[in-house]
Swiss-Prot record:
Intrachain disulfide bonds: none
Protein name per the record: Protein TOO MANY MOUTHS
UniProt note: phenotype after gene disruption: Lack of stomata in stem, hypocotyl and on the adaxial side of the sepal. By contrast, cotyledons, anthers and abaxial side of the sepal have excess stomata, with many in direct contact and producing clusters. Altered responses to abscisic acid (ABA). Enhanced susceptibility to the necrotrophic fungus Plectosphaerella cucumerina BMM (PcBMM).
One MF annotation (Gene Ontology) recorded for this entry: receptor serine/threonine kinase binding
LRR repeat locations: 158-182, 183-208, 210-228, 229-252, 254-276, 277-300, 302-325, 326-350, 351-373, 375-401
Protein function: Promotes cell fate progression in stomatal development. In leaves, needed to correctly orient spacing divisions, to limit the number of asymmetric divisions in neighbor cells, and to promote the asymmetric (amplifying) divisions of meristemoids. In stems, promotes the conversion of meristemoids into guard mother cells (GMC). Positively regulates CAPRICE (CPC) expression in differentiating stomaless-forming cell files. Forms constitutive complexes with ERECTA and ERL1 involved in the recognition of the stomatal regulatory peptides EPF1, EPF2 and EPFL9/STOMAGEN.
Source species: Arabidopsis thaliana (Mouse-ear cress)
Keyword Glycoprotein: yes
Glycan attachment points: 181, 196, 362
Cellular-component GO terms for this entry: membrane; plasma membrane
Organs and tissues of expression: In epidermal cells of developing shoots and leaves, but not in roots. Expressed in the stomatal cell lineage in the developing epidermis. Accumulates strongly in meristemoid mother cells (MMC) and meristemoids, somewhat less in meristemoid sister cells (stomatal-lineage ground cells, SLGC), and is barely detected in pavement cells.
Additional facts recorded: TMM lacks an intracellular kinase domain and may participate in active signal transduction only through physical interaction with other proteins. Overexpression of TMM leads to altered formation of trichomes.
Length: 496
């Protein structure tokens, strides 16, 4: 029921937000608009005054931009701001002259009518620099079959630009330093291109930047020492970045999400990370982190998801009080991190915890008896460790979690004969847990009960996905409902 209650609350939030935010469209408040512009952005406009018109040079620029994307039909529109086609937003000035403030290209979803791009011949037109009032520019899956570099002239779009989204366009080469000239940028999204080279140091000029997504590229070098006080979202996952997590990152006190997963980041997690008291998601999975388990994590009292999977150089124990202050933690993924020692009893006192993955480590000792009374967990993975002793779970816990309770490949685990768990463990398992010897509390030489973990043919159960990427894990489904729409949700935040 807790799972359905969580999704119910998410859908309530989305039902409130969705009328206010169109996919990949920024509605800027009057307070941030240039003084020469009045009212709000409009997709087309009603002619209440026959003198209303689009600024002629901007109209010609839009024609050029549309032709560059294969949309030659736009030249037949007598006035681009009153053409009533999605993908363009305009705003009037005090002389009733309309200016283009937003352009969007690419099919975001089945119900989005933004102009598509001709994949064979589309390119980014330099006429964009003639749109002096442009606040938002979106290109989504427009240029994949005609790979090219990000044009340096985009850095001349001026101080009005607040949102630049160039997702999945197959851009090659380095990120141009000139983008750092867009000093009023709030959202920069270059997700899933083929960019290489280092992250430009000029990005430190983005004093008002709130969301930076460079994920899914081939960027190299170290993570710059960003000091961006307004930054809420930092997503650099799936690159080739090296070096440590920069300590200056903790100066970005507005961070809600940090995803540095699937890079080659080394060294310890900075102790100063406890300054990020608004952080909700921290994903450092599949890097080369080392050092002791950071005690400073307990200061992240807003944290809801912590993923450190696949950092095999940790080789450390988990301190008993490591998660003391994480009262909001819902998802904890520490799989395959070479963690040693026993399972901390304090994990059972995290009352918000729903998903716990500790599989593939070197954990020893018994599963703490305190897990017997844990009612809030919906997914627990302890498989592939060296745990011993009786399984402490109550019958209803085993039934409730079913295949999401994984204990296989712990040769020392056993089930007490009087525990009434024999039929609670499913028959489709692929591994077994033996009955306990009454005298030693260790597995008896004979007699087994099946344990639910994976199907008999070795495949994962129906509906499950192997956690080859932490962000796709079953457990992460709780937060994915929020963060899958987060790129749109953040646009609402920056407009408030």
């Amino acid at each position: 029921m807790a799972r359905y209650e969580f999704f119910r609350q998410i859908f309530i939030v989305l039902s409130i937000v969705s009328p206010l935010v169109r996919s990949f469209t920024v509605i800027t408040s009057d307070s941030t608009a240039p003084s020469a512009l009045i009212d709000g952005p409009q997709t087309g406009f009603t002619m209440t005054n026959d003198g209303a018109r689009t600024e002629p040079d901007e109209q010609d620029a839009v024609y050029d931009i549309m032709r560059a994307t294969g949309n030659d039909w736009a030249a037949a529109i007598p006035d681009v701001c009153r053409g009533r086609w999605h993908g363009i937003e305009c705003m009037p000035d005090q002389d009733n002259v309309y200016h283009v403030v937003s352009l969007s290209f690419g099919a975001l979803s089945d119900d989005t009518a933004f102009p598509t791009c001709d994949p064979q011949r589309s390119y980014v037109s330099e006429s964009l620099t003639r749109l002096k009032h442009l606040k938002a520019l979106f290109f989504y899956r427009c240029l994949g079959r005609a790979p090219q570099r990000i044009p340096a002239f985009l850095g001349r779009l001026g101080s009005s630009l607040q949102t630049l989204v160039l997702r999945e366009n197959g851009f090659l080469g380095p990120i141009p330093d000139e983008l750092g000239n867009l000093t009023n940028l709030k959202v920069l999204d270059l997700h899933k291109n083929h960019l290489n080279g280092s992250i430009p140091l000029s990005f430190n000029r983005f004093s008002g930047l709130r969301s930076l997504d460079l994920s899914g590229n081939r960027l190299t070098g170290s993570i710059p020492g960003f000091v961006l006080p307004a930054l809420s979202v930092l997503d650099l996952n799936q690159n080739l970045l090296t070096g440590p997590v920069p300590p200056t990152l903790t100066s970005c006190g507005s961070l809600i999400k940090i995803d540095l997963s699937r890079n080659r980041v080394t060294g310890p997690i900075p102790e100063s990370i406890n300054r990020l008291n608004q952080l909700v998601l921290l994903d450092l999975s599949y890097n080369r982190l080392s050092g002791p388990f950071p005690s400073s994590l307990q200061g992240l009292n807003s944290l809801q998801a912590l993923m450190l999977k696949g950092n095999t150089k940790f080789s450390t124990t988990i301190p008993e009080n490591a998660f003391k202050g994480l009262k909001n933690l819902m998802i904890l993924v520490l799989s395959n991190t070479n963690i040693q020692g026993s399972i901390p009893k304090s994990l059972t006192r995290l009352n918000s915890l729903r998903v716990l993955h500790l599989e593939g480590n070197n954990l020893t000792g018994e599963i703490p008896l305190e897990f017997r009374d844990v009612k809030h967990l919906s997914e627990l993975r302890l498989n592939d460790n060296s745990l011993t002793g009786p399984v402490p779970f109550e019958r209803d816990t085993v039934w409730r979690m079913r295949r999401k309770l994984r204990l296989y490949n712990n040769a020392g685990l056993c089930v007490n004969r009087d525990s009434d768990l024999d039929d609670a463990f499913g028959s489709k398992s692929g591994s077994t847990v033996r009955l306990c010897d009454a005298e030693t509390s260790r597995p008896a030489p004979s007699g087994t009960v099946q344990h639910l973990s994976r199907e008999e043919d070795g495949a994962l159960p129906d509906g499950a996905t192997d956690v080859s990427s932490t962000s796709k894990s079953l457990g992460f489904s709780y937060l994915s409902a929020f963060f899958l729409v987060f790129p749109n949700f953040i646009f609402m935040l920056i407009s408030s």
